[in-house]
Amino acid sequence: MQRKLARENAFILIFESVCKKDETAEEIFEKATEVRGLEYDDYVKTVFFGSYENSTKIEETMEKHLKGWKKSRISPCAMAILRLACYEIMFMADIPSKVTINEAIELAKKYDDEKSYSFVNGVLNSIALEFAE
């Protein structure tokens, strides 16, 4: 599976976890893969379950970099993109931050409103600088 497709499928799973807070990660994953046939590989599983298990740490990091934004104002789509990208930046050092940010921008352009990608870009650049130190 190409990384771009894997990242998009991980985003779909994370988006569902943002929207379906009453379901466990395992339930979301099972429904998406077995019922709807969402393709996955090791990357998809690692990012989805890793972002779910580390959601508190990821959210704390994101909140430090929101600069004038309240979490409640962020669309579920942008929140899922930020969680995915934050997980990559924070826990997957083998993926360059620039690649993560560019792919997150592409997801925002495809799935969210026209202004979302610049917001996503700004937040992720700030987070990447923190983790580059």
List where the protein language model places each region:
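N-terminal interaction/assembly modules
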Residues: 1-117, 121-133
